[in-house]
Curated annotation (Swiss-Prot):
Positions occupied by motif Involved in motor function: 158-168
Gene3D superfamilies: STAS domain
Species for this entry: Meriones unguiculatus (Mongolian jird)
A biological process term (GO) from this entry: regulation of cell shape
Region of interest called Extended region for STAS domain, as start-end residue ranges on this chain: 505-718
Protein's name in the database: Prestin
Reaction equation(s) it catalyzes: 2 hydrogencarbonate(in) + chloride(out) = 2 hydrogencarbonate(out) + chloride(in)
Taxonomic placement: Eukaryota, Metazoa, Chordata, Craniata, Vertebrata
Gene name of the record: SLC26A5
Signal peptide (from-to): none
Amino acid sequence: MDHAEENEIPVATQKYHVERPIFSHPVLQERLHVKDKVSESIGDKLKQAFTCTPKKIRNIIYMFLPITKWLPAYKFKEYVLGDLVSGISTGVLQLPQGLAFAMLAAVPPVFGLYSSFYPVIMYCFFGTSRHISIGPFAVISLMIGGVAVRLVPDDIVIPGGVNATNGTEARDALRVKVAMSVTLLSGIIQFCLGVCRFGFVAIYLTEPLVRGFTTAAAVHVFTSMLKYLFGVKTKRYSGIFSVVYSTVAVLQNVKNLNVCSLGVGLMVFGLLLGGKEFNERFKEKLPAPIPLEFFAVVMGTGISAGFNLHESYSVDVVGTLPLGLLPPANPDTSLFHLVYVDAIAIAIVGFSVTISMAKTLANKHGYQVDGNQELIALGICNSIGSLFQTFSISCSLSRSLVQEGTGGKTQLAGCLASLMILLVILATGFLFESLPQAVLSAIVIVNLKGMFMQFSDLPFFWRTSKIELTIWLTTFVSSLFLGLDYGLITAVIIALLTVIYRTQSPSYKVLGQLPDTDVYIDIDAYEEVKEIPGIKIFQINAPIYYANSDLYSNALKRKTGVNPALIMGARRKAMRKYAKEVGNANIANAAVVKVDGEVDGENATKPEEEDDEVKYPPIVIKTTFPEELQRFMPQTENVHTIILDFTQVNFIDSVGVKTLAVMVKEYGDVGIYVYLAGCSPQVVNDLTRNRFFENPALKELLFHSIHDAVLGSHVREAMAEQEASAPPPQDDMEPNATPTTPEA
């Protein structure tokens, strides 16, 4: 303890002194009076639920249409300038991203513009976040593209003898139909989950899982964009090992790369990379980030049109952007059975990304978002949007940061951004028909930088949690090679298994006392902490249930070094030695412990089950062992009490209760008391429901705290010593009477 004596500085020590009884469970219950609770009948609850009042109607409207709450309270003078600047900044970024993410979704670019317009307007009415930017997102777009390419591959045969151009248009039309079907189904799933208040499902997508998944998605997006950057013609792959096939296909065709396309792409790539570094370095001085993507689109379009890159150098361009909005159309519901797995994955991932960013920005600005309403809002955006030929949308991380960072206060900024997209759709779309696809590819790749930076999570999780590192790596690897849909399913299963593993393999500690205090700490962690002679204090930091009850029992015996079976075996061995010495073979066959007439054995330690009810055997503590046999016993620590610290146990199931009853019985057979300390009311209720206290004496084993249990053990031992030193009573007493459990 040298470290405790070095550099000691005299300080005023604050102390507290409390005098109270030792609180066993019965003693504490005598001091407490349960409050009377007014229980409502089912009829009263139904009446209250269906009673219509103006306040209830207003709250329902506020809940399902959040705009009715914040729009009347809009502070025009304070908010309008920020929303105006933010809307313009977000809109000029949303234009190139909408065109680029349509390429990921394997649909014509104009559908990216539709997806940047309709959902944003609808989210303004139904969403609860004031700052996130709704619209196409790289990961979701890639998942949509994977389904579209799987059902409508590049080499599909279009009947009717069409030429190459018409064949491409027919293929794209089929892919749009698939994208609409997936979008509708994912929207229905999100809406139903929101109505059923299933917003909590996002908690199963832990941060390591989401970050590993989005990192793998970034690799998928990167490989998908390579062919546009190099200007090569390759087949688009989806499904298992698609990232490998796509990379190999690009490398095999690299000899056919379009130098002009690569040059334009690299020029834009360098401009964006340097410009983003400039924006980051001088963000405090700039009134708004420089809209680099918009400048890249304008520059790329100007160069392409000026030098006629498409005709002269075969550079692939965006192509025709038809003006005007398409009329509503019904998605093909007959495809649902082919895309339901993808729709579920898209619905969950889209919601997870949205609620994560929404909560981050809400915490920063001091308001709350409703996860269930966010599900409903996304469901409406996707399901109704699919009628207008949009594909699945989510929260865009980069646009959300721009919308918030440029002073956006409400979703009116998003509405303004969508109006800029509407202007392009209705009037100016033809200006961007010469935009090289390599420019859009460079824009997408540069925006993946943040996701690729997530590889830095690995050393962090290596230092902090190997389990979270395992989740990150398994999610990344499975999503990378199995595809994003099956990779996500695999990742969720792995994450749930880690939850089971954490509860099945918790940490077990033997506690000791900090001298002259009521503080009990892990004896392996601190030198000052000492074990109390004759008492073992054992702690678990998890619930006790069917998956870990046997492990808990084994850990107790291993960590404390007190195994009742070994003690019983040592006593039998001592009796045999004593019998051999005195020459009385009958002693060797005598039972060591008898419980209510039953010889100690396997049947005496198991609860009986009759008529589906568990019958626990009465617990009798054998506190004595003949002194003449002690010299034949091995020299070990004399443990008379084991205290189970239940302060970190939040529940115990029927299997755990049975295991606990067996433990109390087994240790009682060898003269060791088992006390339970710090049980929560929930654990006490679990024990009561599972009839652990069928023997009322067992309630004396429960104590309010570890210190109460320690003091109770000391009192019991002192009383036992007094009884042992007292003169024997004058009346006759049966010599082999079985002692009963003394009151603690």
